[in-house]
Regions:
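An N-terminal boundary/leader segment
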Residues: 1-54
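Short, well-ordered beta-strand elements within core beta-sheets of diverse protein domains
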Residues: 12-18, 97-101, 212-219
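Conserved hydrophobic/aromatic pocket- or pore-lining residues that grip, position, or stack substrates
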Residues: 30, 52, 74, 80, ...
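Long amphipathic alpha-helix in the N-terminal Rossmann-like dinucleotide-binding domain
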Residues: 50-60, 116-117
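Immediate post-signal peptide segment of exported/extracytoplasmic ligand-binding proteins
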Residues: 59-76, 223
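Enzymes and membrane/adaptor proteins characterized by extended Gly/Ser/Thr/Asp/Glu-rich
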Residues: 71-108
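Short glycine/serine-rich loop segments
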Residues: 104-231
Length: 241
C-alpha cells in the first residue's frame, strides 16, 4: 500500500472514483508513511489518524453507494497549523495557543471537507507563521526532506516536507512574503500563492488581508490547482473574498 503515497493527488482521485482503490487503503498508506518517516523530520505535529480512519470509512461507503463525490473525495490532506480545525489542536506554533482546540473549522478548511478531503494531520509552522524557517517552541523544528539537519524553509515548511516525502498527497499553506513559495522551492514541491481574496482568510486582521493569503501545495501543479479549486470561495468573514 505504501506505493499509493507516491502517486499524484489527481491520479489518486481518479483511482478512487473508478473504485480501483479505497479511501481506507489510501489513508492507511499515508499513516504508515508518516509513522515511518516523520520521526526524523517533524512535519506532521498533530496527527489525526483516528479521525482520518473514520472519515475514510465514510468516504468508501459513499463510493460504493454511488453517491456524488467531491473534488477531493477520499484524499488525505494536511492542514497548516495556522488554520482552525474543529475539535483538532490548532496552536499557530505559539505557546500561547498550545492547548487551543477550535469549536469549528474556518472557511477554507470547511470547503476542503465539503469536497471530500480528509484531514490527516496538522503541519508545522513558525510562531504565527512569521519566519522563513519552520520551528517553534511548541513542537520544535522541521527538517529538510533531503537533509534533515538543514532548514526546509517557511513558513509552510511542515506541509512542504510532508508532501515531498509522500506523507500525504495534498496540504494547505499560507503566504505573506514567500511562505508558500519558499518551502516549496526548498523541498521540491509546488506552492501556489493565489491573488488576495481567492481563498477566504477569515480571522486575519483587515490590514493584512490584501497581503497574507491562504493557498494550496502539492507535488505537481495540477495537484495544487485541484486543492485550490476546493479552497476557494466567498466568506462573509473576509471582506476581500
Amino acid at each position: 500500500m505504501s506505493d499509493l503515497c507516491d502517486k499524484t493527488a489527481t491520479e489518486l482521485r481518479s483511482l478512487i472514483g473508478r473504485k480501483d482503490i479505497s479511501p481506507v487503503e489510501l489513508v492507511e498508506s499515508c499513516i504508515e508513511r508518516i509513522e515511518t518517516t516523520d520521526k526524523a523530520l517533524n512535519a506532521v505535529v498533530t496527527p489525526t489518524f483516528d479521525h482520518a480512519r473514520n472519515e475514510a470509512a465514510q468516504a468508501e461507503k459513499a463510493v460504493l453507494d454511488g453517491d456524488d463525490l467531491g473534488l477531493l473525495h477520499g484524499l488525505p490532506i494536511g492542514i497548516k497549523d495556522l488554520e482552525a480545525t474543529s475539535g483538532i489542536l490548532t496552536t499557530l506554533g505559539s505557546q500561547l495557543y498550545a492547548n487551543h482546540v477550535p469549536e469549528k473549522d474556518q472557511g477554507s478548511v470547511a470547503n476542503i471537507r465539503a469536497e471530500g478531503g480528509i484531514v490527516i494531520g496538522k503541519t508545522n509552522t513558525p510562531e504565527f507563521g512569521a519566519g522563513a524557517n519552520t520551528r517553534n517552541l511548541v513542537f520544535g523544528a522541521t527538517g529538510n526532506p533531503f537533509a534533515p539537519g538543514k532548514t526546509c524553509g517557511g513558513s509552510s515548511g511542515g506541509s512542504a516536507v510532508a508532501l515531498a516525502t509522500g506523507m500525504m498527497p495534498l496540504a494547505s499553506g499560507s503566504d505573506y512574503g514567500g511562505s508558500l513559495r519558499t518551502p516549496a522551492g526548498f523541498c521540491g514541491v509546488v506552492g501556489i500563492r493565489p491573488s488576495p481574496g481567492v481563498v477566504a482568510a477569515e480571522g486575519r486582521p483587515v490590514g493584512l488581508l490584501p497581503f497574507s493569503v491562504l493557498g494550496p501545495m502539492g507535488r505537481a501543479g495540477e495537484d495544487a490547482y485541484l486543492l485550490l479549486q476546493a479552497q476557494m470561495g466567498v466568506d462573509p468573514h473576509d471582506p476581500f473574498s
